[in-house]
């Protein structure tokens, strides 16, 4: 014989009531914190009242509906807040980009200008190849005054005879003798000195010629004649 299992219905109803009361209070607190769903409080209160009258099943359904409504409202609010914040961030970023891009682009030099400034100056090939050669010392030019040769000085016949008579006496007259003769002939003393020098050279040539005439043939190769002039 099957015996029925005893079941305490009152215990189940009490537990449902406690659960519905706790869920209703949580939904009411969420609705008051958001302050944008005033109907949620009324729904929670109605759910509490109906739970006392109709039992735990209905109370659970109403609480679930209030939770779904509050979740949908909170999701919509979070989406709206996120969209507003994203729009504001986009606007701020766009304005900051516009503010920062213009002065930077205006202040930044162009790539061509930077490359032209960094490039070294071009040097012609001819100037780069030139190599200085060895230094050659060039002595300064000396301006030598050339003596102008005037017309040759010619003595008169009587002047030559006076100098020839003195030459027969001495071939090397001293300075005083040449000075007296120059005053007598009315000529510079230098001219008298030059005439005596030339006359001695002429006399040596005459003497050498006479000596060579008197030498026998074949002996000329062994004779060395030195022509020198004694100092005056």
From Swiss-Prot:
SUPFAM superfamilies: Homeodomain-like. It is found in: Nucleus. Residues 45-114 are annotated as: Disordered. GO terms for cellular component: nucleus. Residues 148-207 bind DNA. Signal peptide: none annotated. GO terms for molecular function: DNA binding; DNA-binding transcription factor activity, RNA polymerase II-specific. InterPro entries: HD, Homeobox_CS, Homeodomain-like_sf, Paired_Homeobox_TFs. Keywords: DNA-binding, Homeobox, Nucleus, Transcription, Transcription regulation. One of its GO terms (biological process) is cellular response to retinoic acid. Residues 68-105 have a biased composition (Acidic residues). The keyword Amino-acid biosynthesis does not apply. The keyword Transcription applies. Probable transcription factor. Belongs to the paired-like homeobox family. This is Homeobox protein Rhox13.
